[in-house]
Amino acid sequence: MNSSGVEQGVVIAESEPPRGNRSRYAFACAILASMTSIILGYDIGVMSGASIFIKDDLKLSDVQLEILMGILNIYSLVGSGAAGRTSDWLGRRYTIVLAGAFFFCGALLMGFATNYPFIMVGRFVAGIGVGYAMMIAPVYTAEVAPASSRGFLTSFPEIFINIGILLGYVSNYFFSKLPEHLGWRFMLGVGAVPSVFLAIGVLAMPESPRWLVLQGRLGDAFKVLDKTSNTKEEAISRLDDIKRAVGIPDDMTDDVIVVPNKKSAGKGVWKDLLVRPTPSVRHILIACLGIHFAQQASGIDAVVLYSPTIFSKAGLKSKNDQLLATVAVGVVKTLFIVVGTCVVDRFGRRALLLTSMGGMFLSLTALGTSLTVINRNPGQTLKWAIGLAVTTVMTFVATFSIGAGPVTWVYCSEIFPVRLRAQGASLGVMLNRLMSGIIGMTFLSLSKGLTIGGAFLLFAGVAAAAWVFFFTFLPETRGIPLEEMETLFGSYTANKKNNSMSKDNEVVDGQ
């Protein structure tokens, strides 16, 4: 066997590519991995407008419409649950291909649907692709990116989701000019096109270096790390960290090795994650599930999926005005997700989450209040309340996009130990999609039961509770190597306990 590329890399340092080329390579990898997110975002965005025409064309009830809107995320639990095992078996790259194939088939089925059951089959197939895509894109990007730009690059899936949502909104506006029975079919069927570009793009992507190490392919792993790290020395250091995390001795340096205990490496994952986790792993799991729950339970998909309905309740009566205002939501959401992505490595995950959730709480409170005032004054045109409602929808999506939107995926893709990462991330995605499905499938009923203003005040309460959770439970992870996250969470938990014990001792001494 040849000696590892790690040793070779030290010798040929003079041929090291410039740092800018390395950054561009990692940047390109992140973009290609995030293509799945454009497809997902398009589906989310396009349904907000297509639902108006589907309801009229297929004569659906409100309950049927709610199910149609939210069921994609329930179906995605199938993909999310299988994504961890699939990505460990096939690799991160071919799992992305699989997600694209499901998206392609699902979009075609929905575009050619002639009745409600037919379109639900298309939603099921596309939903499986959603589950795969939402887990694998941030995990792949986190494993390829160097620590210095990991937050920025891992935010790409959320950026592309928002670009997809905006494209869906624009598609709604233009295809709404077609006859009713054709317009919504074009809106949904066009979603198959990006899947073709995804399949082509994946051919240019390298495999995740951490997955390659798990397969014993150290030479191939180093080649990827060498192209995506800022320096040759950083690539060597990253490979050494991954080897230690996987349990490979330092003296095993050949290009291809037999990973010790590989056959049993995956057998205890769920036990270590759910049954008998260490204190640090338990903390990591709770943090991941908590942040995913808060992201969706605070009502973002109610706004994304039902923007035309919300604007109708706020006083915008024509469908054209509702769709234009919805396009504005997409523009604001996309612009601020770019802002959040650019500052996540500068200000850190924790600061953005707290700022974001605080802004969401204020926006939801104002939105709920304005909609309540409008609802209690039927027949009156309260311009200030209408203006406040429209404005606070925009500020809500803006504050969401600057923190809770991108940071959720960044944070949860980087905190799990490498052995538990795929399964841990998939659990977070499953909860995220479950909550998104619940919100999507109950918002109209919730609005009838509590009024639409009351529904948003409920979301405001969730945002307030989430802010407290983030403040007390989430440590900062900016700049921390992936292999040191378990130590970070362990020390954070220990420090919390020590501080609590110190306060108790002070109380006892004072008595």
From Swiss-Prot:
Record carries keyword Hydrolase: no
Segments crossing the lipid bilayer: 27-47, 63-83, 94-114, 124-144, 151-171, 186-206, 284-304, 324-344, 351-371, 384-404, 424-444, 454-474
Membrane topology per record: Multi-pass membrane protein
Keyword Membrane among record annotations: yes
Gene3D superfamilies for the chain: MFS general substrate transporter like domains
Predominant place of localization: membrane
Pfam families, per the entry: Sugar_tr (PF00083)
Keyword annotations: Membrane, Sugar transport, Symport, Transmembrane, Transmembrane helix, Transport
Compartments, as annotated in UniProt: Membrane
An MF annotation (GO) of this entry: carbohydrate:proton symporter activity
Classification via PROSITE patterns: MFS, SUGAR_TRANSPORT_1, SUGAR_TRANSPORT_2
InterPro entries for this protein: MFS_dom, MFS_sugar_transport-like, MFS_trans_sf, PLT1-6, STP/PLT_plant, Sugar/inositol_transpt, Sugar_transporter_CS
Family in the record: Belongs to the major facilitator superfamily. Sugar transporter (TC 2.A.1.1) family.
Purpose of the protein: Plasma membrane sugar-proton symporter.
Protein's name according to its UniProt entry: Putative polyol transporter 1
